[in-house]
UniProtKB/Swiss-Prot annotation:
It is found in: Secreted; Bacterial flagellum. Keywords: Bacterial flagellum, Secreted. GO terms for cellular component: bacterial-type flagellum hook; extracellular region. It comes from the Bacteria. InterPro entries: Flag_bb_rod_N (IPR001444), Flagellar_basal_body_rod_CS (IPR019776), Flg_bb/hook_C_dom (IPR010930), FlgK (IPR002371), FlgK_helical (IPR053927). SUPFAM superfamilies: Phase 1 flagellin. It comes from Bacillus subtilis (strain 168). NCBIfam families: flgK_ends (TIGR02492). This is Flagellar hook-associated protein 1.
């Protein structure tokens, strides 16, 4: 038969189990607004039945339950939902970075008002047209000089501003690399702590939450693959183990392991820059250098690399800002060369041969390099307030032929970057391509943000604390606790009857 005190022990176990459930519920409520917290529950299981199976087991009507015990405190989390969230978070990090970089470029070019380069070029063209109609007007020549100076200064401003934004992108790129390394270091520390807790049969849920939050942040910067390494000892089956993390390329192939969860090692990232151009040449993962053009791991880091600029294995400069700066440099160079050639063939009002209207200094091997930032109107034109403008071909007072040719430089065909086009059309093409690219980046950023929010909602429905649900659970566990307490009282009354109310005859 069962022990006299078996019912008391069964009730005690019930009290202990329901108390653990209530404590877990209280912890859920307390952390309802804690970032990264995953709701928890006590996994309850029935204790062994009595009597145990054996040849000498006591003959009873059947095995009797002996109560309940808390097996573990587990998180309510779905690894597939984590994967979906991090996948969208990765895309969002990449497209958001590209969209912001393109938006900053649009802000610099400023083609929505009258201060943009297109408007300034048109004003310059109009001043040349006015000069061709009024060759004897000193004011017309002075206006051409000022408008030409405005063109040069606008080129200078755009080049300088784009270079400044590019420098800011480099700083953000370096900060992102530091952030990645910091997250990896923190994850490695958590791995070590988890490896100490799990083998003794406990689940470090708080450490799991911290780790998942850090992995979420890391996923926005680089594309990662997370794998789990089971702990030894007496680890529970539900123990997650330590994590190892690999960086993936666009084809989901590994570029290298950055966190080794078995050996607790971190391979830090480093951005390497080309000495000549200053652009990204490679990304180091530990001791392995990956060429910048081959580093295709999506995320904000790649967004910064593609925006700031990188150099290919054959020396080509690629990226949003280097390519725009190169296009503007080539445009400024070819425009100035064509304009100067026409101006040199003309004659000033005083009958002197025209010289260069624009001055610029380029490199010997790459004359276009930095041309947009260096172009200026020749000092002779500025100092004479336009008197030295060669508007004529013959020197005759009413000869406006060269002024007309100068105006045609802006609208006529010249070769820029191997294309037969006009200066105005070439720049309009640059702005059009930028607008399309920025619009597409904004669209993708918006779409991925929506998908990220949907993935987050799905995950929150599974893992977030619902106060309504916790209140319901609290009432359920409270009633169970009260019933167990009542069972203790009942057992006490039964024992009192046995001890104090039986066998009193003959006293």
């Amino acid at each position: 038969m069962t022990s006299t005190f078996m019912g008391l022990e069964t009730a005690r176990r019930a009290l202990s189990a329901q108390q653990a459930a209530l404590s877990t519920t209280a912890n859920n409520v307390a952390n309802a607004n804690t970032d990264g917290y995953t709701r928890q529950r006590v996994s309850l299981e029935a204790t062994d039945y009595f009597p145990a199976v054996s040849k000498n087991a006591e003959k009873t009507a059947g095995q009797m339950g002996t109560g309940v015990q808390g097996k573990s405190v587990e998180r309510i989390r779905d690894i597939f939902l984590d994967y979906q969230y991090r996948l969208q978070n990765n895309s969002a990090g990449y497209y958001d970075t590209k969209a912001k970089a393109l938006s900053q470029m649009e802000g610099v070019l400023n083609e929505t008002d009258d201060s943009g380069l297109n408007s300034v070029l048109n004003s310059f063209w109009n001043s040349l047209q006015e000069l061709s109609n009024n060759t004897n007007e000193e004011s017309a020549r002075s206006v051409v000089a000022r408008k030409g100076q405005a063109v040069a200064e606008t080129f200078n401003y755009i080049s300088e501003s784009l270079t400044n934004v590019q420098s800011n992108l480099k700083a953000e790129l370096n900060t992102t690399v530091l952030d990645v390394n910091s997250l990896l270091s923190q994850l490695n520390s958590l791995n070590k702590q988890i490896a100490q807790v799990e083998p003794v049969g406990l689940l470090p849920n708080g450490l799991y939450d911290q780790r998942d939050l850090l992995i979420d942040k890391l996923s926005s910067m680089v594309d990662i693959k997370v794998s789990y390494n089971k702990s030894g000892g007496n680890a529970l089956a539900s123990a997650e183990g330590t994590v190892s993390i690999e960086i993936l390329d666009k084809n989901k192939q590994s570029l290298g392991t950055v966190l080794d969860g078995k050996n607790y090692e971190v391979s830090e990232l480093a951005a390497n820059y080309d000495n000549e151009t200053g652009l990204v040449s490679s990304i180091s993962i530990g001791d392995t250098a990956v060429q910048a053009e081959s580093f295709s791991s999506k995320g904000s880091l790649l967004g910064f690399i593609e925006s700031y600029g990188y150099i290919t294995a054959d020396g080509q400069e690629k990226g949003v800002y280097p390519e725009m700066l190169s296009d503007l440099d080539n445009m400024a160079l070819e425009f100035a060369k064509a304009f100067n050639e026409v101006h040199r063939n003309g004659v000033t009002k005083s009958g002197e041969q025209g010289g260069d209207f624009f001055d610029f200094t380029g490199g010997e091997t790459e004359p276009a390099k930095g041309a947009a930032g260096k172009i200026k109107v020749a000092d002779s034109i500025i100092d004479s307030k336009g008197a030295n403008i060669a508007f004529s071909l013959t020197g005759a007072a009413n000869d406006n032929a060269n002024a007309t040719k100068l105006a045609n430089v802006l609208t006529g065909k010249i070769t820029i970057n191997g294309k037969e086009t006009s200066v105005l059309d070439y720049y309009a093409g640059l702005i059009g391509e930028l607008g399309i690219e920025a619009q597409e980046a904004n669209r993708l950023a918006s779409n991925t943000e929506t998908q990220l929010n949907d993935a987050d909602i799905n995950r929150q429905q599974m893992s977030a604390v619902s106060l309504d649900e916790e209140m319901t659970n609290m009432i359920q566990f409270q009633h169970a606790y009260n019933a167990a307490a009542r069972m203790v009282t009942l057992q006490d009354e039964l024992l009192d009857k046995v001890i104090n109310g039986m066998g009193v005859g003959g006293r």
